[in-house]
Amino acid sequence: LAVLRRIERERRTSCKKKSVTNKYIIKMPMKLTNGVSFPVTGKNSARSTTSTGKRIMAAALRGVGADKEADAILNEKNWRFGYRKHMENVAVAMSKSNKDCVKLARAGLEEARKIFTYRIKDGKEESLERVVGRVGESGSSSSSKPSREIHTGIVYGEKRFKGQGKLPDVEYEGKTYSGPELVSLAKTFAAQDQALDSFAMSVEEAVKHPEWFDLRGKVFVLIGATSEMGPLDILLQCGATVVALARKNSRSKPDKWKNLLRRVVDTPGKLVIPITRAQTKDDDIETLGNIAGADATSELLEIVNWLNSNSIQKLVAKDSSLHIYCGIYLDGEGFVRASVAMDCIVDGCTNASKNSPPTLLYIDTPSHVHFVSPKIRATSEEYRKKAPAGLKILKSLGFAKAPKYISTYDSSDWEIHDGLSIQQGPNYAVAKFLQR
């Protein structure tokens, strides 16, 4: 224990010294890619994720008059490890009112549009805001014209839809739960304070209404359809029409699209995909897999035009709308670019929608700043008191993290849980902020 304490003490001391901290951070030059790009921020055409992320978060705070906190972000010298307290300040500013939440979010997204650029193959760059603003217009400059037309491919499931629908089964600890058993399991979690009462109530309502899971005629756009945690399979099983967006096959994943297309076969769903040419009756799954794919970050304009085309819009019922899921995950700076691109795609579809505005969906993350009820905090602290002795020792050494809570603006019925993971870094935090 003495040795472990000394190691942890030295680690903490070294992290406080900027010179030592930076010694272990290898700054790789950013690889220039076509499409959504970080702006030039320094000498020799340098593009900094740090200054860009700081500008977005500072602009968000200025949107609600939090100038002092915004200045603190811009003056932060150690953004890689110091971004955490600033994310907490953003959450506090959002806690003032629902109106401030919207104003702060809008200000952050608008700043991202203003400073990010859109780069085409010949190296020309233009403000992303200008490019997105001209989506669908004729006579736009060459830098904002789509480089290709995306065609529509459709693969139908071979299984017939039975009955009204049904809440999908849930596997837990080697057992499959459905119906009353699933409700009982959810209530057990709630009784043990492992989930909120509203969670158990929602599961019970879903079991009572199997018709909710008849998604025939509903159109879901999955941006990042191949993501591990995406809802592709469950939507297809419920008979939905899924418009799948993902990058083309690569050397590391040569069968990505073929494997994705096979997932629709044993379902009552329908899979709509972007392809490079018109589909023919002779195209099988392998053929379609080789010509499928579109990149959200580098083919943003092409994707927006495709989603707004007649071939996609005719799938949407007059009394319905698109449901757009933003699910791309990339490492590092790519995640920020992807989040900005997904927001632009959503905006392009919203502005062109003739029906109701699209419904937006995304997967949240536990490793960010969240609003929680006092009951959640009390339960968390109670469980921590009952933790095994070994876990308490690790916590005292700094190897196990205890939840951190901060007060909201007016200390109301909500508290703020800081679940940020420093290992993930500020790019991840900024990207998830943009999605939220």
Describe each PLM feature range.
Residues L196-R216:
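A short, basic/flexible loop-to-alpha-helix module at the beginning of a structural domain
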Residues G217-L236:
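Glycine-rich adenosine-cofactor-binding loop
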Residues L288-V369:
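Extended alpha-helical scaffolding regions
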Residues T359-R436:
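Long, contiguous domain-sized segments
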Residues P254-I312:
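Extended charged low-complexity segments that act as oligomerization/scaffolding linkers
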Residues Y24-V90:
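Non-catalytic protein-protein interaction scaffold segments in large eukaryotic complex-forming proteins
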Residues E69-A195:
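Low-complexity, highly charged intrinsically disordered N-terminal segments
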